[in-house]
Design a protein with these regions (language model features):
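Conserved MFS/SLC helix-loop-helix module at the cytosolic interface between two early adjacent transmembrane helices
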Residues: 70-106
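Structural signature of the two symmetry-related core transmembrane helices
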Residues: 86-100, 291-306, 383-386
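Helix-to-loop junctions at the C-terminal end of transmembrane segments
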Residues: 71-83, 168, 276-289, 373-374
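Glycine-rich segments within core transmembrane alpha-helices of 12-TM secondary carriers
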Residues: 147-168, 357-365
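Helix-loop boundary and gating motifs at the non-cytosolic
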Residues: 8-70, 225-267
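Cytoplasmic helix-loop-helix junction between adjacent transmembrane helices
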Residues: 114-153
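C-terminal membrane-cytosol helix-exit motif in multi-pass small-molecule transporters
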Residues: 190-210, 395-400
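Hydrophobic core of transmembrane alpha-helices in multi-pass small-molecule transporters
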Residues: 30, 98, 109-125, 315-329
């Protein structure tokens, strides 16, 4: 009995060796995560409730994805050459004006251009975030750092998703309209993201990072690794885009669930996803990165497929929550793994390339998924997504089972 007790460790103890500056970087970024969580519900559920079609919402998402794809590589190269810290902070400054526009209008003439700005900020984040955490940690501590990032990020995303659950109570107590509460919340969150950017600047203003005169993937091992990793990941991106960003719309169309309920559902999913990070580092340590990724993603795919057969809302929600937790348990492991198999000076560019080849097919398939839902075809997106997931998982194991992170 005593030996069992000595082996047990508090869950949070796995993060004790993560550098304090990395922890505060993660904590300060949670203000932006909170805002983006609400923003996602606003786009994918509230806009549909006020009469904007799933097809138009898909276009907004596609425009966001297009700007992300077009600028990710230039921004990634700039991050490697000019500093990942500066790119991350500058990217965060683009979020407040985007939120302010959404708080002021529902006119697509303005919302669609804001999709462009959203893509730019996302590209800046992708090119800098993983690379910056990897730069500030060692191989030993890195999985725990990425797990903490995933944990805090998803819980704060989830809190943003859950905000609409309080809106009926606020409306009843104040007499404010639904539109006023939704837009007012967006305005307040815009102010919070401004504060978040200021805190990040204060934290990192004296951080010294290594700049690289060149940022490109030479022909050879690095190029082959990034190409294989990214192409396989793009298959999952295409499958995910068919339905995952559109889950609130699917719940609305098939079961009549409004954003006051779909928001908390997404919140619960993100909390579970965040808590799954406790298992991520442990699985990677016990089984290795590749096996841990394959097992969690394959298990998730079973529940993805099962969603097509859900005949009532409670069952659909339960299946979705399990799928989300299992699929995203692999995310911090994949982030840490990619940063470990790529040289330090190419991390920003590698992150950008991987993000592009995931996001481009994801953006295209979101439009396809929105059109299918608009046409009343609610099952096919899940069948297609599950098939693409399974293909990618098998390919990933076949290609990377013998490739280990660099010391």
């Amino acid at each position: 009995m005593s030996s069992e007790k000595t082996q047990r460790k508090p869950l949070l103890k796995m993060f004790k060796d993560v550098p304090p500056k990395v922890k505060w970087l993660i904590y300060f970024s949670s203000l932006t995560n909170l805002a983006i969580g609400y923003f996602i519900v606003y786009i994918s559920a509230y806009l549909a409730e006020v009469g904007i079609s799933a097809r138009d919402i898909g276009v907004i998402m596609a425009v966001n994805g297009a700007s992300f794809v077009a600028l990710s590589i230039p921004i990634g190269m700039m991050a490697d050459k000019r500093g990942r810290r500066n790119i991350m902070i500058l990217g965060s400054l683009g979020i407040p004006p985007m939120l302010l526009v959404y708080s002021w209008t529902l006119d697509l003439t303005y919302l669609i251009p804001m999709g462009l700005l959203g893509g730019i900020t996302e590209a800046a984040f992708l090119a800098s975030w993983n690379a910056l955490i990897a730069d500030m940690t060692t191989v030993k501590v890195r999985p725990a750092a990425f797990s903490l990032s995933f944990l805090v990020g998803n819980i704060t995303f989830g809190t943003g998703f859950a905000l609409p659950a309080a809106f009926p109570m606020i409306q009843g107590a104040t007499g404010w309209s639904s539109a006023y509460v939704h837009s007012g919340t967006m305005f307040v969150l815009a102010l919070l993201t401004m504060a978040g950017s200021a805190l990040l600047w204060m934290l990192l203003k004296n951080y010294k990072e290594t700049l690289h005169e060149t940022s490109r993937l030479e022909r050879g091992e690095s190029l082959r690794i990034v190409a294989k990793f990214s192409i396989i990941n793009s298959t999952i991106g295409f499958g995910a885009g068919l339905i995952i960003p559109l889950i609130p719309i699917w719940l609305l169309y098939k079961f009549g669930i409004l954003d006051t309920y779909s928001g908390p559902i997404l919140a619960a999913a993100n909390v579970l996803m965040g808590l799954s990070a406790f298992g991520s580092a442990a699985l990677a340590k016990k089984y290795g990165d590749v096996k841990a990724i394959v097992v969690t993603q394959a298990s998730s795919t079973i529940f993805m497929f099962s969603l097509a057969f859900a005949m009532n809302a409670p069952l659909a929600v339960a299946l979705y929550l399990i799928r989300a937790a299992l699929m995203n348990m692999a995310s911090p492991i994949m982030d840490s793994y990619l940063m470990g198999i790529i040289s330090e000076r190419q991390r920003g560019l590698a992150s950008a390339i991987n993000g592009i080849v995931w996001r481009l097919p994801n953006s295209v398939s979101t439009v396809i998924g929105g059109a299918l839902l608009t046409a009343g075809i609610y099952d096919l997106p899940f069948f297609l997504a599950a098939g693409l997931y399974l293909t990618a998982i098998l390919l990933f194991y076949a290609v990377f089972k013998d490739i280990k992170p660099k010391k």
